[in-house]
């Protein structure tokens, strides 16, 4: 059931910050003999690499993203434009991991600036990079493939401001940064909220929805207007204080019919539904999950697959009736720490599992009906993002 894996091991071991990994650095990449039409690309946060998996076979090719041998690049999420053979990857340069019970203890705590890297899809060679702010979170392409959006999950900023005391919560805000996808020119930036992470755009690319982990809100960004004006929608009546969330929204997912936005919450351990027409969350549509909800995907307009942690698992949720239709757990030798679900154009479903952040993580193909694993690929350490070669 497990596919073969080729490539480097944990290249992040004993690595330092990204201070020496200058913006002019590139990497050679390597030959990838998996056709793009059947390939998926997975960022490996702990092993500084991208795994390419053959969705119709067993092959896995792991390509290093080492800009500098002593830097821990920590690729975190990616977006693909197959038409221009481009891959955009956020490089986080996190601090050295300390012994902690929290497997994500280093996430959002970097002191060094991050980077947005553009790679060649054919070889995964790094062609160019641009500085972003500390702790880049999500990276997405607009549907017209003209702009790249980068959020910043900067909990360190929030904690530093809180420790000083007396400052306005707005000084904790991290930015949404927008680049031209063609030439990597920075088009603008806007402070949006405390520790923004998941972002999704409407099909017309006029609006972005940003999940704001550190301030318990969903921010709506007007991408069509100068300055990218924002409006804010709290997730509930009893938000946590800035930097200490009660709900902890991690991702925002737009339904295929674009009528609702689903926000998945870590601390709140639920999914919440925003009605786009009224710009209000619907309390009767909230679905408690009794586990941390990460980055889900829609199967249809009202059916959602949600990856869960603490306890680990996967839930299929009927949003129309606000209930869990099915729930599955996995043996630890198959999947540890489910992070993101992706649904391919052919309807096949994939689940990325972080693993223990040291040994290889995994990608599972999931049966839509039973939620049972159909196939497994071993990838690099701490995988946390996935995109398809035909996007």
Language-model region placement:
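Predominantly soluble domains enriched in secretory-pathway, periplasmic, or organellar proteins
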Residues: 10-391
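Sec-dependent bacterial lipoprotein signal peptides
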Residues: 1-8
